[in-house]
């Protein structure tokens, strides 16, 4: 420790530098958001609650290819399918366990018909474990409720897909 360092520590140079830094930021504009009352803007790529979409004629989009089930790293998706009378295949069961889901978005990327999507909805809860187990009917209801926002987000992000 040299004489210069000794004199600097004697006059508490580090303390003064720290106080100066604190003083500069003390009067700066606050950036804290008071969450329930104020909301920050969300990206169109936000990954929230899952939804199943329908075509404009009301028919569900999912063709039961099971790509989303295969690619899910958390194994949160369960699909069962059945043949229709017209020969096409559709889901008879499509369940997502949100307690397992890591919201990675792989299911959304793997879907060839844009049937399963992640919405901007993040304010949902469950009081029991079973409340976070979404069935096909629940996912279709979420999709029907938020279809306008989903379609707008898909249109905005189309050039990046």
From Swiss-Prot:
Example of a GO MF term: iron ion binding
Family: Belongs to the complex I 23 kDa subunit family.
Record domain 4Fe-4S ferredoxin-type: where: 52-82, 92-121
Cited InterPro entries: 4Fe4S_Fe-S-bd, 4Fe4S_Fe_S_CS, NADH_quinone_OxRdtase_chainI
Annotated Gene Ontology cellular component terms: plasma membrane
Domain of life: Bacteria
Localization in the cell: Cell inner membrane
Catalysed reaction, written as an equation: a quinone + NADH + 5 H(+)(in) = a quinol + NAD(+) + 4 H(+)(out)
Coiled-coil boundaries: none
Bilayer-crossing regions: none
Functional note: NDH-1 shuttles electrons from NADH, via FMN and iron-sulfur (Fe-S) centers, to quinones in the respiratory chain. The immediate electron acceptor for the enzyme in this species is believed to be ubiquinone. Couples the redox reaction to proton translocation (for every two electrons transferred, four hydrogen ions are translocated across the cytoplasmic membrane), and thus conserves the redox energy in a proton gradient.
Keyword terms, alphabetized: 4Fe-4S, Cell inner membrane, Cell membrane, Iron, Iron-sulfur, Membrane, Metal-binding, NAD, Quinone, Repeat, Translocase, Ubiquinone
PROSITE patterns per record: 4FE4S_FER_1, 4FE4S_FER_2
Protein name as it appears in the record: NADH-quinone oxidoreductase subunit I
Any one GO BP annotation for this protein: aerobic respiration
